[in-house]
Amino acid sequence: MIRLHHVAQSRSFRTLWLLEEMGLEYDLKHWNFFDGSMRSPEFLAMSPAGRVPALEVDGRTLFESGAIAQYLCETRPEAGLAPMSGDAERAEFLEWLHFSETIGSLLANLTQHHIVLRDPAMRSETVMRLEAKRLEKCIGAIEAVVSGRDYMLARGFSAADIAVAYGMVIGRYFVDLAKFPAVSAYWERLQAREAFRVAVSKDGEAVIYKQAFYPPPEA
């Protein structure tokens, strides 16, 4: 049995969605960012930094959503969600799969300053503005690709789309996607996928992101 350790509205949504796209049977265990349980010895034994996702699979536990995606795609190639080694699109697939962590780091900083740091004296409006601009630049890079095709790879939908879609799933709270017409259409295509809708239904209660945070504060 595969077991996903998950928090709603987090990077573990990528793994949840990927499992649904692959049609794999799995058990879903929800954790809470705020109750201290992710600092427990039980959780840290699975994910030493105390982060989600953690995935129990094939007799071991993996952490890091990008590594999990690459592992699942390589060990279950019949799902057809990644070009394999030697394929002409393999390098491009890996670029976009891991580009998602550039997006994730920006979203983490924006989340810290807009949501987690509740004392205004601890927040940096400069960081909010700079990170929002950097996020826009990343979404602009996706815009350039999907302006000419439906998905990140010419072959069609892949795990790379699941990875970069985090820029829309969470990024839409910090950047107005209406500025990016091709990305907006791409986001609609992704939301229309049955596996995406099922993953959303299993994600859990929205306790982190409940409103938009753009435009960022002015100097």
Question: What are these regions, as identified by a protein language model?
Answer:
Residues 203-219:
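Acidic/histidine-enriched, glycine/proline-rich intrinsically disordered or flexible terminal extensions
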Residues 1-129, 217-218:
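GST-like domain detector, emphasizing the conserved glutathione-binding G-site
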Residues 33-34, 160, 204:
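Conserved beta-strand edge residues that scaffold enzyme active sites
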Residues 100-192:
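GST-like fold's C-terminal all-alpha helical module
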Residues 19, 55, 68, 142, ...:
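Residue-level signal for nonpolar/aromatic packing positions in well-ordered secondary structure
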Residues 73, 167-168, 200:
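Active-site-flanking alpha-helical
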Residues 79-84, 106-109, 151-155, 197-202, ...:
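Short, hydrophobic secondary-structure boundary micro-motifs
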